[in-house]
Amino acid sequence: MVLDNLGSSLRGSLDKLQGKSRLDEDDVEEIVKEIQRSLLSADVEVSLVMELSSSIEDRATGEEPPAGTSARDHVLRIVYEELVDLVGDSTDLPLKSQTILLAGLQGSGKTTSAAKMAWWFSTKGLRPAVIQTDTFRPGAYDQAEQMCERAEVSFYGDPDCDDPVKIAREGIEATADADIHIVDTAGRHALEADLIDEIEAIDSTVAPDRSLLVLDAAIGQGAKQQAREFNNAIGIDGVVVTKLDGTAKGGGALTAVNETDSSIAFLGTGETVQDVERFEPNGFISRLLGMGDLKQLSERVERAMAETQEADDDWDPEDIMEGSFTLKDMRKQMEAMDRMGPLDQVMDMIPGLGGGLKDQLPDDAMDVTQNRMRDFDVIMDSMTEAELEDPRSVGASRVRRIARGSGTDEETVRELLQQHKMMERTIKQFQGMGEGDMQRMMKKMQQQGGGGMGGLGGGGGLGPFG
């Protein structure tokens, strides 16, 4: 994930300040050097790195910590505020009728991003349409059509036409009933003159309200030239950063934002059309520093529960809070969790679980956990309806039968039953809570996630410092 190494190394440096009430010059120097090393290794431009580190150093040595605030929390607040300022605000994309033009080199992820953005707008109650104008890349039309089918959004393209400007013009007309028009353009392997000429012609034809540059998170220092060329041609209003689910450094996105004086609009976090986030600087930096992002978490939970319920009309998640908790309910919870995205991303959003705790886990911990969930699903396939409804009926002989039938071992079957008991106990605790109890519990979670900071608000999109 973008700047992930920065988050890990910063948390390590900040943890060394635990118990200190005041900072000395050596403390500040170590933190500033760590920031410089991490940002430079993430391909952030040198001038940006020096500007940020200088600002943090000046504030850390010149500002007095508020009464009752530890040295660690004082520096954490400064680093948080300066990093939010570095990444900038999110691109202004009002939820109303507009045309969005996508630009970028071949392989940057434009076509996938077009479908993902269209899906995102559709979840906000709008009617988006994707217009595919790429006549250069073989398979571009088919890929766009398939992605839009998965996103369940309107699509226009013409595989028999080799004039991208004509396709763009006719696409706008053919999808006139759409609220949002997302125009996907061709890319090249390099910034060639014909690419710039083509996108300038499309820009003149569709007159976009917003032009977004799509960048692969692995782009590195090459982002600066790309951003400058496209900005000179059509004017870039924002950046879409793709492929953040891998090991990409991501610093090139910050360089592009600085070069175009724009901002980040969306983050692509996975391969499916739902793996997209509207960029929220406060929540993003909060996650980076291990303080969670409850706003993004709640959006993912709500979406995952709705999709799970839609797939099974007979299941209602609210029933869990009123009746018994069966293995069927546990299975639905697992399905919803799977729909929330990769487990490591979800952990980053939970105050107290992301950040430092995740850093201590083995590298393969998330994969092992998700594989175990798949094992549990296979085991439940080998259980009878009565066993799924009443796990207490599963004795030793049934455990052996289920293990043989599922191709797993008895230990894993018992682990599933034990996991169910733990979840059942947790559900019962929630069942006895009123709304006020729930809010107090969430507030406590947020405070724990921020290292005990008295001023922690933890609102996700508003940032952890209110």
Curated annotation (Swiss-Prot):
It is found in: Cytoplasm. The keyword Disulfide bond does not apply. InterPro entries: AAA+_ATPase, P-loop_NTPase, Signal_recog_part_SRP54_M_sf, Signal_recog_particl_SRP54_hlx, Signal_recog_particle_SRP54_M, SRP/SRP_N, SRP54, SRP54_GTPase_dom. Pfam families: SRP54, SRP54_N, SRP_SPB. GO terms for biological process: SRP-dependent cotranslational protein targeting to membrane. GTP binds at residues 104-111, 184-188, 242-245. Residues 448-466 have a biased composition (Gly residues). SUPFAM superfamilies: Domain of the SRP/SRP receptor G-proteins (SSF47364), P-loop containing nucleoside triphosphate hydrolases (SSF52540), Signal peptide-binding domain (SSF47446). It catalyses: GTP + H2O = GDP + phosphate + H(+). Its main location: cytoplasm. GO terms for molecular function: 7S RNA binding; ATP hydrolysis activity; GTP binding; GTPase activity. Disulfide bonds: none annotated. It comes from the Archaea. It is an enzyme of class 3 (hydrolase). SMART domains: AAA (SM00382), SRP54 (SM00962), SRP54_N (SM00963). Its EC number is 3.6.5.4. Residues 446-466 are annotated as: Disordered. The keyword Protein biosynthesis does not apply. GO terms for cellular component: signal recognition particle. Belongs to the GTP-binding SRP family. SRP54 subfamily. Involved in targeting and insertion of nascent membrane proteins into the cytoplasmic membrane. Binds to the hydrophobic signal sequence of the ribosome-nascent chain (RNC) as it emerges from the ribosomes. The SRP-RNC complex is then targeted to the cytoplasmic membrane where it interacts with the SRP receptor FtsY. PANTHER family: SIGNAL RECOGNITION PARTICLE 54K PROTEIN SRP54, SIGNAL RECOGNITION PARTICLE SUBUNIT SRP54. Composed of three domains: the N-terminal N domain, which is responsible for interactions with the ribosome, the central G domain, which binds GTP, and the C-terminal M domain, which binds the RNA and the signal sequence of the RNC. Part of the signal recognition particle protein translocation system, which is composed of SRP and FtsY. Archaeal SRP consists of a 7S RNA molecule of 300 nucleotides and two protein subunits: SRP54 and SRP19. This is Signal recognition particle 54 kDa protein. It comes from Haloquadratum walsbyi (strain DSM 16790 / HBSQ001). The gene is srp54.
